[in-house]
């Protein structure tokens, strides 16, 4: 099992390129299930605003939230079968993931990419009997429910695992819902890229803070929104607190002034959002 990346330098061009090919590949294979799944995780910023400068670092895996309501009557099993039947995907190290390898054609070792499946904690996906993949299950993540509030349909072009160029469409978590999921992730694990993704979105998306604040105010009674606000208040109380320091860790600068600058920026972005709520 490969260690979780913690720094910007851990996201190499080869790994990101391979993961993007898998994203395109999955979008093509599961085109019939487009309305039953939403891209969450590290590819969301890249897909929502691909022309941003500086560019988002991307991701080295693919995270998909599954809509249990639309995956009844055995469609969940059918979704998995479509991927497995390509011969390109196998069971991963974790119960909720499939893996594939991508040959980038550069003479280097093929890159392993993980595809992970998530669902809200309050839903159940019907299992198939006999099981297609022994021990396979989706990862339960309460905030995953936010992905299905207002997903955006995104069309994008890229290479598939085979190297063929393709244009595909996927549902992608909206900016306000993505920030909800990232806030909840902050409360449940130690992954510096969560803060990088969150702050990148607030910094680069047009009027991001205003957009998120307006959406969250309209949903102030939503428990996921209320919890997100509380988490951000706790984690970003001051520059020295956990949230801002996570951004400094991700950028991994050896210069104390630069580390302080990143932490300060994270603190200011989140505090500006909180001030509007």
What do the PLM-derived regions correspond to, one by one?
Residues 1-277:
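Compositionally biased terminal segments of proteins
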């Amino acid at each position: 099992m490969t260690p979780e990346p913690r720094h910007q330098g851990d996201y190499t061009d080869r790994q990101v390129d391979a993961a993007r090919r898998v994203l395109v590949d999955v979008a093509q294979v599961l085109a019939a299930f487009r309305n039953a799944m939403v891209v969450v995780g590290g590819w969301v910023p890249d897909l929502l605003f691909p022309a941003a400068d500086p560019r988002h670092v991307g991701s080295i895996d693919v995270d998909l939230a599954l809509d249990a309501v639309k995956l009844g009557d055995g469609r969940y099993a059918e979704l998995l079968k479509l991927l497995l039947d390509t011969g390109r995907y196998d069971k991963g190290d974790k119960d909720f993931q499939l893996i594939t390898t991508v040959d980038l054609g550069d003479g280097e070792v093929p890159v392993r990419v993980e595809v992970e499946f998530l669902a809200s904690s309050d839903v159940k996906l019907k299992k198939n009997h006999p099981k297609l993949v022994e021990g396979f299950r989706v990862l339960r993540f309460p905030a995953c429910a936010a992905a299905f509030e207002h997903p955006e349909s995104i069309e994008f072009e890229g290479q598939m695992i085979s190297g063929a160029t393709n244009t595909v469409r996927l549902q992608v978590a909206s900016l306000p819902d993505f920030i909800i999921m990232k806030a909840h992730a902050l409360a449940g694990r130690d992954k510096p890229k969560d803060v990088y993704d969150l702050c990148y979105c607030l910094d680069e998306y047009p009027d991001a803070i205003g957009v998120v604040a307006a959406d969250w105010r309209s949903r102030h009674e939503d428990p996921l929104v209320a919890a997100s606000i509380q988490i951000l208040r706790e984690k970003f109380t001051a520059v020295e607190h956990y949230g801002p320091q996570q951004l400094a860790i991700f950028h991994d600068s050896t210069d104390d002034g630069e580390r302080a600058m990143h932490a300060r920026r994270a603190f200011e972005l989140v505090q500006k959002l909180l001030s509007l709520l």
